[in-house]
């Protein structure tokens, strides 16, 4: 039987106390009496010019809405409070998307809401095929809670999209996500990220996106990343 010294017990006790304090602090930042609201945004709309593959077979507004609906459906089936930020096909202005997001933040508390905006990437103007490829996730500039959400999504992508290119930007601030002051990220009060789910003007990515394996991989990546983020605070198994 191992015997700990008094000094060892003191260190162990201190470690336990610090752990409890940190977990308590994290959870205090979230109103646990109110469920986490998971908002899923889908890029652009039916009226948005361009935003398609060069052959016209892949439309960003339609594709992101298809996957967003699947993500919300799966989350709801597992008992989570999730909804589409833009349920219709119309291209809702960014200011209105932010207004809807922040209305939830004001009602529930900004720490009880997260926003994930789904998009497809493009390297050119949509008239010809390009060579860029891969999945990536964006946050606004600076260190915020959005970085933790992005980290959870990146870890999920690395596990699920194993044979695909995962685009990272560790050089800027030491974490994987890319940083841009996109309007919806900069003005949303809650943790918010924007995922660029491969390139619609890459033949390689276009074929993957349109495959059932590709669609499932992207949906599963978002589900796993979101649930990993929520479980970090609430210790909810998934």
Indicate where each model-derived feature is located.
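Structural recognition of the beta-strand scaffold that forms the well-ordered cores
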Residues: 37-41, 82-86, 113-118, 136-139, ...
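Extracytoplasmic/secreted envelope proteins and their assembly/folding machinery
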Residues: 68, 72, 95-98, 134, ...
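Active-site-adjacent substrate-binding region
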Residues: 146-174
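Solvent-exposed loop/turn segments at secondary-structure junctions
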Residues: 45-46, 88-92, 120-126, 142-145, ...
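Active-site histidine-acidic residue metal-binding/catalytic motifs
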Residues: 30-100, 124-125, 131-133
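Active-site-adjacent mobile loop/cap segments within catalytic or ligand-binding domains
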Residues: 39, 52, 58, 117, ...
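Mature extracellular/periplasmic domains of secretome proteins
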Residues: 97-111, 182-187
